[in-house]
Amino acid sequence: MIHDKVFKGTTTVGLVCKDGVVLATEKRATMGNFIASRRAKKIYKITDRIAMTTAGSVGDAQFLARLIKVETNLYTIRKEEEPTVKAVATLVSNLLNSVRYFPYLVQLLIGGVDKTGAKIYSIDPIGGAIEEIDIVATGSGSPMAYGVLEDNYRKDINVDEAVELAIRAIYSAMKRDSASGDGIDVVKITEKEYVELTPEEIEAILEKLR
């Protein structure tokens, strides 16, 4: 089967902050030892205050991102309110579990801010969903990322501090994991805004780490 021959690697991280959440990924997509893309998108905006990161099969991730965005839009129309982070995580969990015998080859983070506060959920390929109370990393570079996150995370960290820590964690993984690399994407979400950092802003932070 193709899944026995094609492997995907990546690094994604999520941090719960006192004023929001931060999600970050690198941009490399691989097929075994082959670098298939240096511009892979791994963070998807789901609602105005919720995003999803993906690790795993690119095709499965893109399809799920489209499907989840449509379903959340329908939810908003029917309920006349935005879904909570937990509601989106539950939707994704149920969807993945419904096809568990032919699973989507993905590991996801759903993070955002709603009326209950800042939340991040990690979801495995067959729908297991866990609320992460502080930090989380997924993908082949996660061991290196966790080392940085666990040494530097604080319960009172704010989103701006968390952006720098997330970039540092991804950068550490990129140096040691061959399946991670080729740039970084970062999103910070607060009660008031959803911000995707520009390449220039990310590069300025990286310069301080080199």
Curated annotation (Swiss-Prot):
Assigned keywords, A-Z: Autocatalytic cleavage, Cytoplasm, Hydrolase, Protease, Proteasome, Threonine protease, Zymogen
GO molecular function: threonine-type endopeptidase activity
Primary localization: cytoplasm
Localization terms from the record: Cytoplasm
InterPro entries hit by this protein: Ntn_hydrolases_N, Pept_T1A_Psome_bsu_arc, Pept_T1A_subB, Proteasome_bsu_CS, Proteasome_sua/b, Proteasome_suB-type
Catalytic center residues: T10 (nucleophile)
Propeptide: 1-9
GO CC terms, sorted: cytoplasm; proteasome core complex, beta-subunit complex
Known regulation of activity: The formation of the proteasomal ATPase PAN-20S proteasome complex, via the docking of the C-termini of PAN into the intersubunit pockets in the alpha-rings, triggers opening of the gate for substrate entry. Interconversion between the open-gate and close-gate conformations leads to a dynamic regulation of the 20S proteasome proteolysis activity.
EC category name: hydrolase
Reactions catalysed, as given in the entry: Cleavage of peptide bonds with very broad specificity
Pfam family name, one: Proteasome
Annotated function: Component of the proteasome core, a large protease complex with broad specificity involved in protein degradation.
Subunit text: The 20S proteasome core is composed of 14 alpha and 14 beta subunits that assemble into four stacked heptameric rings, resulting in a barrel-shaped structure. The two inner rings, each composed of seven catalytic beta subunits, are sandwiched by two outer rings, each composed of seven alpha subunits. The catalytic chamber with the active sites is on the inside of the barrel. Has a gated structure, the ends of the cylinder being occluded by the N-termini of the alpha-subunits. Is capped at one or both ends by the proteasome regulatory ATPase, PAN.
Family note: Belongs to the peptidase T1B family.
Name this protein carries in UniProt: Proteasome subunit beta
